[in-house]
Amino acid sequence: MRIPFLLIIFLPFSLPLFSTLKPKNIIVLANSNETDSKALAHFYCQHRGVPTNNIVFLSTSSKETISWDEFVSTILIPLRESVIKQGLIKVIRKEPSDAQGKRPYQIINDSIKAICVCKGIPLRIKSYLEKVSALEAEYAKKIPEKLRKNEAAVDSELAILLIKNTPRAGFISNPFFKNQNSKDKNYEKKYLAVTRIDAPSYQNAQRMITDSIATEKKGLIGRAYIDNGGPHQKGNQWLKQIRDQLYEIDFDFSVENSRRLFQQNDRFDAPILYFGWYAGDYSGVFRNHRFRFPPGAIAFHIHSFSASTVRNPKKQWVGPLLEMGASVTLGNVFEPYLEFSHHPHLFMKKLIEGCSLAEAHLYSIPVFSWQSIALGDPLYRPFAKDLDQQWADRDLIETNSYLLLRKIQKTLNEKNYNEAIDLANSHFFEHPSLALGLKRAQIYYELEKPNMALNAIQFARHLSLYTTLEMGLGNEIAQLAYKWGDFSLALGIYNNLFQQEALTNEMAKAWLPEGISLASRLNHFDLSDKWRRKLALLKK
């Protein structure tokens, strides 16, 4: 941040900070003018064991976008004063004051490591166009013209809450970015990991907390999806690295490499992880009004203005993803330029290592006093339990078919194909599911046993009910049946899909031509005529 203030001298401190992050190390920030904001702060402290003395209430604007004057007078200065007054940061006050009447402080205790910003605190600071000081003007000359911006994310400014004499234009490098050993080489500065619990509704903000806590107990279970068709090689490479990371931890995943995003007719079951770019507004599969993420999901879509609002559930990406049930997301309030936004593969690297959201955020963001934010519980550790621990507790987990998929994937990655099919077979007859049935068929096909592969998907003939997120999975099985020559099975699956309440117009428009072709091929002209009429209505 960007105005000269109190002289602060930091004593050296040791790291890692966040591998030992405790509830007592977190400031919880709320808007005293917002009932929901105050309630959320208490809710978080109650559920995470944060001392209530760590709550700081600020009387600030209820708007998402504020001016620099509002930020300084209603957030920055009151927050500094409050953390000292409440004993959250201990200081030695020195006399006399400087020429501006500001007292220099010496920090003697640095127990606070993170800030949890609650719904109700402003989101971003608009551009400051008035005349700047000579010091700031001189600084601005030293940075590229495109970076001489002073609009910013509130959270990114709070990360440098205790650093003096920072300019408004441009950004400040984050010394913890990619720091393999988490060694702070710049002892005169102290940075805070700032994450935000915010969503379009208070109920969803609460859910972000409770889902995170519940997911930590059982671990992440589901599949991953990557939309990797963005406009720049660097972003595509980042997401490719995430794909490689998922392979290393035996996660089942799907990748869309074209410019199109995953659509409603694509497979998208159990999306516990989603990474994508580069669309300006949420679209594709996320336009299905029935769509919901599983509890604890991590989902983000790289875009310059993905977090220009959090409160609107129908605009950009952050608000809609949280409204649809995500527990963690990343975003940008203004244009950050790609290289200065979160590096998602680094973010995932830390999470996979078992670190908290706070640590992953700090590790993966190259700069502060800029545009990027992280939303979620700072203490959330989605990979706190590894696969072996999850497998040991599998009988206690309701969604264990997707846990089984990961166990099978681990066996396949180790080239133990026979063991993988034995594992799939032994559990399928006890806990049948579309996902597991498809996996059995795919393994048989890889083992060059096409008849057994085809036999493995025959169960789909008898299914009569599909959930919203199973519809695309059903289509994938129908396509395999067609590919492997069982046209009757493929037609039967499509006939079932077309009768589902979960069928959307987008699904129908994508699948009806295939169904019509199959019905005609098998002389079911009543069906083909019926579906032609339906398709014609949809195209009007």
Question: Model-predicted segments: where are they?
Answer:
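Generic helix N-cap/helix-start motif at coil->alpha-helix transitions
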Residues: 397-404, 431-438, 467-475, 504-512, ...
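C-terminal soluble interaction/assembly domains
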Residues: 291-364
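Structured catalytic cores of large enzymes
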Residues: 64-240, 245, 369-383
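Solenoid-like repeat scaffolds
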Residues: 425-431, 459-467, 496-504, 534-540
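Caspase-like cysteine protease fold
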Residues: 353-415
